[in-house]
Curated annotation (Swiss-Prot):
The gene is rplD. Part of the 50S ribosomal subunit. Belongs to the universal ribosomal protein uL4 family. Pfam families: Ribosomal_L4. GO terms for biological process: translation. GO terms for cellular component: ribonucleoprotein complex; ribosome. Keywords: Ribonucleoprotein, Ribosomal protein, RNA-binding, rRNA-binding. Residues 69-80 have a biased composition (Polar residues). This is Large ribosomal subunit protein uL4. One of the primary rRNA binding proteins, this protein initially binds near the 5'-end of the 23S rRNA. It is important during the early stages of 50S assembly. It makes multiple contacts with different domains of the 23S rRNA in the assembled 50S subunit and ribosome. Residues 45-96 are annotated as: Disordered. Disulfide bonds: none annotated. It comes from Chlorobium phaeovibrioides (strain DSM 265 / 1930) (Prosthecochloris vibrioformis (strain DSM 265)).
Length: 208
């Protein structure tokens, strides 16, 4: 697959790049994508949820009333799960949600995600550019020139660029990261994937 390289003004630069078929033209493995995305979202969970049982809740050492003669059901503690202020039966306890996915499955999922975007025509390549200072306005202008100002965009750079990353931090519709850091979820959670030209080589090195 070939794509025309765009300038920051949104025009064609006259240059053409060839996307590798094994990364951008592969058969989409929905199961690999499912496993990887499920793992990514599960691993984000902290698992710090906790409720107290009747043994942990404060108080309740005293018998609320005598055993016999009141007409009520017998009670041994004011912190019984049946009473207001009592402990919780089978409540949540802290535990991890981590799910392991093999490296080959992760790589297959990322290739599937890129291939899906390529099939839908949602991959753009822009010439390598740099910003002189951290400012949102010039970066927003570039997105507008490319027709991405109102679309959820994942922008991939060849390496971490603090100026570009921080310039786009205030723009809610754009997510900027170095190419090798992009996960399957990041790719699928965007409308368009915008590559800086040099970032394509990084992807080929990572997934090739």
């Amino acid at each position: 697959m070939e794509l025309k390289v765009l300038t920051t003004a949104g025009t064609e630069s006259g240059e053409v790049v060839t996307l590798r078929d094994d990364i951008f033209g592969a058969e989409v493995s929905e199961h690999a994508v499912y496993l990887d995305v499920k793992s990514i979202l599960a691993n984000r969970r902290q698992g710090t949820h906790k409720s107290k049982t009747r043994a942990e809740v404060r108080g309740g050492g005293r018998k609320p009333y005598r055993q016999k003669g009141t007409g009520n059901a017998r009670q041994g503690s004011t912190r019984s799960p049946l009473m207001v202020g009592g402990g919780t039966i089978f409540g949540p306890t802290p535990h991890g949600y981590d799910q392991k996915v093999n490296k080959k499955v992760k790589a297959l999922a990322r290739r599937s995600a890129f291939s899906s975007k390529a099939q839908d025509g949602r991959i753009l390549v822009v010439e390598d550019f740099k910003l002189d200072e951290i400012k949102t306005k010039p970066f927003a202008a570039i997105l507008k020139n490319l027709g991405l100002d109102e679309k959820k965009t994942l922008m991939l750079t060849p390496e971490y660029n603090v100026i570009i990353t921080r310039s786009g931090k205030n723009i809610q519709t754009v997510n900027i990261m170095s190419a090798e850091k992009a996960s399957t979820y990041d790719i699928l959670n965007s409308h368009t994937v915008l590559f800086q030209k040099a970032a394509l080589k990084k992807i080929e090195e990572t997934l090739g």
